[in-house]
Swiss-Prot record:
One of its GO terms (biological process) is riboflavin biosynthetic process. Mg(2+) 2 binds at E38, H153. InterPro entries: DHBP_synth_RibB-like_a/b_dom, DHBP_synthase_RibB. Catalyzes the conversion of D-ribulose 5-phosphate to formate and 3,4-dihydroxy-2-butanone 4-phosphate. Its EC number is 4.1.99.12. This is 3,4-dihydroxy-2-butanone 4-phosphate synthase. Binds 2 divalent metal cations per subunit. Magnesium or manganese. Mg(2+) 1 binds at E38. It comes from the Bacteria. It comes from Photorhabdus laumondii subsp. laumondii (strain DSM 15139 / CIP 105565 / TT01) (Photorhabdus luminescens subsp. laumondii). Pathway: Cofactor biosynthesis; riboflavin biosynthesis; 2-hydroxy-3-oxobutyl phosphate from D-ribulose 5-phosphate: step 1/1.
Length: 217
């Protein structure tokens, strides 16, 4: 990871704190994984606070695959089958079947419709019949234990929104460049500056969580 590009966002722990505070303020954050992993930056929002405008921005600048990160408990509550029985993807990305709100949407593709679907999925009393399958929102199941178990954007989203005091549900989408290629560290930092978002790495979050657990033990 190019630490020079990230140094203006503070130390490792400060970057995590900035991200937590941004989420509390209803803003988005940029999360980078390691260069030897996916080497991608994801736009992440707390599912509870994400607005239609923020969804529109995410669709406009992201890959278009907008994912809803959920816990295993929530996946079971919604009775969402995993997308495949045997996951052969290199990083074991845990997609479930795709979803759409059963009510209040048209085609399900618009920013407003995707927010409606997310709201339906994370409602406290949500039940399987509240969602149609397939749809235009891609749920991801996070590993219990978060980034301390799997250093993925899915787990980072759940950890960050939980640290910010929200229910464990986050929305993410990979940032792409204008030519459709994946944004790397430099482009992620440029985008973050333009849209007033903090930047944090998954490695930062691992160190932060390890420190919390060490203090607690």
């Amino acid at each position: 990871m190019n630490q020079t590009l990230l140094s203006e966002y503070g130390t490792s722990s400060e970057r995590v704190e900035h991200a937590i505070n941004a989420l509390r303020d209803g803003k988005g954050v940029m999360v980078l994984d390691n260069e030897d992993r996916e080497n991608e930056g994801d736009i992440i929002f707390a599912a509870e606070t994400m607005t239609v405008e923020q969804m529109a921005l995410t669709i406009r600048y992201g890959s278009g695959i907008v994912c809803l990160c959920l816990t295993e408990e929530r996946r079971q509550q919604l009775q969402l089958p995993m997308m495949v029985e045997n996951n052969s993807s290199p990083f074991q990305t845990a997609f479930t079947v795709t979803i759409e709100a059963a009510q209040g949407v048209t085609t399900g593709v618009s920013a407003a419709d995707r927010i409606t679907t997310i709201r339906a999925a994370i409602a406290d009393n949500a039940k399987p019949s509240d969602l149609n399958r397939p749809g235009h929102v891609f749920p991801l199941r996070a590993q219990p234990g978060g980034v301390l178990v799997r250093q993925g954007h899915t787990e980072a989203a759940i950890d960050l929104v939980s640290l910010a005091g929200f229910k464990p549900a986050g929305v993410l989408c990979e940032l792409t460049n204008d030519d459709g290629s994946m944004a790397r560290t430099l482009e992620v930092v440029q985008f973050a500056k333009l849209h007033n978002m903090p930047v944090v790495t998954i490695e930062d979050l691992v160190i932060y969580r390890q420190a919390i657990e060490q203090k607690a033990s």
